Structures are given as C-alpha cells and as structure tokens.
C-alpha cells in the first residue's frame, strides 16, 4: 500500500467505502478489467446506462470484468436517496450484480481521492472535472486508467475496448 506521501501509481493504492460503510481495498481487483462509473437514479441516462452495464457485466464477468459503481448527487441532485434506497433500486429494477459503493463527490474540494486520481490520469479533452452522471473510466488488469468515456457513451459501445483488455477475441 502506498504511504500518504507517495503519489498513487494505480487504482490499487486506494481504499473506498462500500454501501455499508466498510473499507474496501481496491487491490482486491488486481487482475480484473474495471469500469468505474459515477451513477445516479434519477437521470435521463439512468435506464440506458444501468441496462447496458448489467448486460455487459453478465457477458464478461466470467472473463474478468468488474464494474464499480459510485453514486453521486453532484449533478442536478439526481441521486438524493440513501445508499439503501439506491442499492434497492439498482438491484431490483436493473438486476445489477456488481458492487454499488458509498455515495461520493467526484468534483470539488470534497472529491473522493479515487476520483481525483482518475481525473488526473485521464483528463485531456474532458478537462479535470467530471461533466455529468455516468462518466466511465476503463482500467486495465494492472490498475492503470486506460480510457475515459463521456456520459452519453453507452457501455455497449465500449465493448471492443473491454474485449481487448480482457484478451477476448
């Protein structure tokens, strides 16, 4: 684990909170390809993104894909519910089997350290801020951020990149 003074080298240097408030060391995902996404329950993009995320997860979870979903209420107040309400909605309505973590800020002074790292790894065209719900980061098996996708990019359209990282033909 990286000490506080050293700069994080990969997402494995971070610990986040799960939906129950327990610490989760992201190094448990070593060897997995990850989609890290900020989610919201009341966004116009909710249905299409959650449906696609669930489908792509079912298709590739056995090959090593994991999706890490982080609820965020910073965009139009579209994630106002408690973490229990969010989990219930996602698991019941969208049959999500991937982890939903504790609610986070993705921008500003209180942004989660993981999100500060993600943004610094893949800023570029997007700048340093997350623009809206369902911004997606693709992470390789070594914990490196390899790509960033806009909220309107569907998880299904990421499939070619996901397959490449998984080594699936």
Curated annotation (Swiss-Prot):
Tissue expression pattern: Germinating seed, apex, flower, as well as in stressed tissues.
Disulfide bonds: none
A Pfam family this chain is assigned to: GSHPx
GO molecular function: phospholipid-hydroperoxide glutathione peroxidase activity
Alphabetized CDD domains for the sequence: GSH_Peroxidase (cd00340)
GO biological process: response to oxidative stress
Keyword Oxidoreductase carried by entry: yes
Coiled-coil residues: none
Family of this protein: Belongs to the glutathione peroxidase family.
Listed name of the protein: Probable phospholipid hydroperoxide glutathione peroxidase
Species this protein is from: Nicotiana sylvestris
Origin organism lineage: Eukaryota, Viridiplantae, Streptophyta, Embryophyta, Tracheophyta
